[in-house]
Every structure is written in structure tokens, then in C-alpha cells.
């Protein structure tokens, strides 16, 4: 219940919940960066799809060049969250990894290219494992269930009803 148990623990505030979510994203970015670095080191093949060549241009290491921006985004996300949590620097959400699709889309392109260029074994190895983890865990590693003490919900509903239907009470 870390960060989500608001139905009996007065210490769990919205800022605590936000911090827990950021810590989870921080850890995810660190783990994904590590995995991407391993892939980049192992993908020395030159033969690739036109889709990758359009992005990388003529290079002897197209897969490495193609995957580096994703790895760098993981690193940037990890560092930005750490700077925010430790040094209280502002967090620019536009620079952070924001969806699992940001991870999966380039990995799908790499996998398709590897398969089309007779590298099915490589496409079905660590790359596929990383894709499965990204699909399963997304950018935060875990879902956070937030439990709120029920009188808070009652109060919120009362405020909505009071504002919207106050004029009907006098009829």
C-alpha cells in the first residue's frame, strides 16, 4: 500500500503518493536504461530495414544509433526525477518518458527489422524480453491503488451536489 493507503493513515498525503509514483518511475527508467545499454552493445549488425535507415542515415551500426535516443531518454528521465526528489528541482514533464508506447514503438521497429533480415533468434531473445517487461510494467513498474477514507468521498459529493443543486432546494 506504499503511497496509496489514505483510509486510515494520516501520513499518506497527495505529495507522498506523488513521490511514490515518481520513485517507481525513477526505478523503471534505471532498469530500462540498463537493459537498453546491453542491447545496444550486442546489436552490432549492419543490415537493417529502411525504416531504421530513414532515422539513422548511412551507418555501420544502425541498431545502436536507432536505440540510443530511447536509452538517453531513460537516462534523462532517471536523472530528472532524482534531481526533483533529492534537490527539489522543478520537474519538466515534457522531457520525461510519458508512456509505455514510447518504449514499445522503437523496440517494435527494431524487432521487425531483425526478423526481416534473418535475425529471428536475436529478435526473440533479450529484445523480446524487454518488450514484454515494458508491456507488463509500463513506465512506473507497478500500479498504485489509492484507498481513501469514505467520509472524504461523501464530503466531495456533498460539495458537488450543493453547488449544482442549491437553487433547486428553495423551490
Residue ranges of model-derived segments:
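Extended, well-ordered protein cores
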Residues: 1-14, 24, 142, 150-151
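Extended active-site and interfacial segments that coordinate phosphate-rich ligands
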Residues: 12-38
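Extended, charge-enriched "interface" segments that sit outside catalytic cores
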Residues: 41-168
Amino acid at each position: 500500500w506504499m503511497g496509496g493507503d489514505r483510509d486510515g493513515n494520516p501520513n499518506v498525503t497527495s505529495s507522498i503518493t506523488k513521490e511514490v509514483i515518481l520513485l517507481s518511475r525513477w526505478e523503471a527508467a534505471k532498469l530500462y536504461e540498463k537493459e537498453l545499454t546491453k542491447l545496444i552493445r550486442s546489436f552490432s549488425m549492419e543490415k537493417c530495414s529502411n525504416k531504421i535507415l530513414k532515422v539513422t542515415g548511412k551507418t555501420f551500426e544502425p541498431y545502436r544509433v536507432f536505440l540510443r535516443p530511447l536509452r538517453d531518454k531513460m537516462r534523462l528521465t532517471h536523472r530528472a526525477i532524482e534531481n526533483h526528489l533529492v534537490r527539489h528541482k522543478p520537474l519538466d514533464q515534457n522531457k520525461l518518458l510519458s508512456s509505455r508506447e514510447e518504449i514499445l514503438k522503437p523496440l517494435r521497429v527494431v524487432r521487425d527489422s531483425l526478423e526481416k533480415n534473418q535475425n529471428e533468434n536475436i529478435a526473440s531473445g533479450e529484445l523480446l524480453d524487454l518488450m514484454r517487461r515494458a508491456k507488463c510494467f509500463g513506465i512506473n513498474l507497478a500500479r498504485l491503488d489509492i484507498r481513501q477514507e469514505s467520509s472524504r468521498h461523501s464530503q466531495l459529493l456533498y460539495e458537488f451536489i450543493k453547488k449544482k443543486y442549491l437553487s433547486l432546494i428553495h423551490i
